[in-house]
Amino acid sequence: MPNNRREAARITLMTHHGLSDRVVELLSSLNLPAVLAENARCVRQNVKAGYWGFSSLRMGFSDAASEIYRLTVKRESAVPLLCRLIEGLELRTPGRGAIYAQNVEEISQRDLPDIELEQVKSDWLLSDLALITGIQTKSGGGENLYKVALKLGAGVPVVGIGIGTGIRDRLGLLRITISPEKELVHLMVPGHDANGLQRLLIEEGHVDRPGGGFLYQTPIQAGMVDPLLRIGRQEHAASIEQIIAAIDDLKKSTAWRKRFFGVEDISDNASVANFTHREISFFCYEGQSDNLVEAAMQAGAAGATVSRLRTLYLQGADAGKSISC
């Protein structure tokens, strides 16, 4: 069966682990054949009362087990599917997760699923978004990117785990000094602030230093962010995150909370400069990634990061079966 190259939309859903059964049930009801799932963690700031009863608050970090689900559909089905998943999983409630769609080119032997969904009102979907992805060694000298992102109020980071290959494999004995484990930080941010936040993340996270990792941004077609940056003690009737989410809903945009002006504005020239590369993702069965990585290195790629996912089959005789990939 030949490989087909076509335009598609990749849907990425990041939810709390407790919603896993509900996600699978909802996707099955939409007649989707399968979905890729990845274990991850969602990091938020944890606000606690000060020591000895003082009024000052202490700030820490709290991890919550999360799942990242990925599937590709026809581009015309992306927005209706986003709306259906947001409604079915109640993602407009802060803390339940985030979702977004990106336009991609896909090469696969499998046909894109036919989804029959009614066209729904999508005014509350945000379209002025960008995805910042950072890949950093777990034992790196710089501060963790997710901590920097939370301190900057950039958004709620979702962190996955991967194994670095490519450059490290060429270092010989020196590679024992570099941990192969990588943290993959996924961060949805307003598109108009993406340049400024990317610059701050690079500086504060020491990404521009040798061994500091790398960071890049990709455009988002539409999505819904999770505004719950902080959990724990709350001193007012509504948190600042709830207020921001309400204003986003009223304004139908995040442009009102622009943080960087002047040199950080995204002009036509800046937009072209930001997207000079392409992200290439291979999804294969476990044990086949080495050949793909080797081919990528021979074609000129500087490195690759391998993550472990699983394919969840949702229909037919294989429904409920999970295969590592």
Question: Model-flagged regions — what are they?
Answer:
Residues 1-325:
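Positively charged, small/polar-rich N-terminal and surface patches that mediate targeting and assembly
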